[in-house]
Amino acid sequence: MKRLMMAAAFVAGAAACLPAAAQFQKPEDAIKYRQGAFTVMAAHFGRVAGMAQGRVPYDAKVAAENIAVVMAVSKLPLTAFGEGTDKGAPNRAKPEIWRDAAGFKAAADKYVAELAKLDAAAKTGTLDALRGAVGAVGGTCKGCHDDYRAERYSQ
């Protein structure tokens, strides 16, 4: 619960910074911002995925709380992919993010749409509904990573 509260504080602080893109003084600030948001999303989605995969006992309330955090943070990283933020700090963003901005945005929008379905599935309170939706969200993550995230860090 303490971690959930810390994540909620992060979300509240990040939301207060919107529009964040205008506040990045240097490219490395944008890179660190988006990496932080992705780290929070991965941690909370990982908890839900663990339940769906049977590695962690299923708890409908905990699943819903974690999904709420992921949904709150899900749109934040996009504000940090502005022009010139491909370099400045070690990161794994491929040049295709900027070359194919429309495709990148479409992939992000698909992720957000699948998250909404995951949220609805979690509200049913059934593990079976959650399992299918977790797989769909994971598929959007993989698709975006395959196209837009490099395997190694670059600067």
Predicted segments with their positions:
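Bacterial N-terminal signal peptides that target proteins for export
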Residues: 1-8
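A periodicity- and composition-biased signal for non-globular, repetitive helical segments
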Residues: 8-9, 40
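N-terminal signal peptide c-region/cleavage motif recognized by signal peptidases
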Residues: 17-19
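Sequence context surrounding c-type heme c attachment/ligation sites in exported
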Residues: 24-60, 66-155
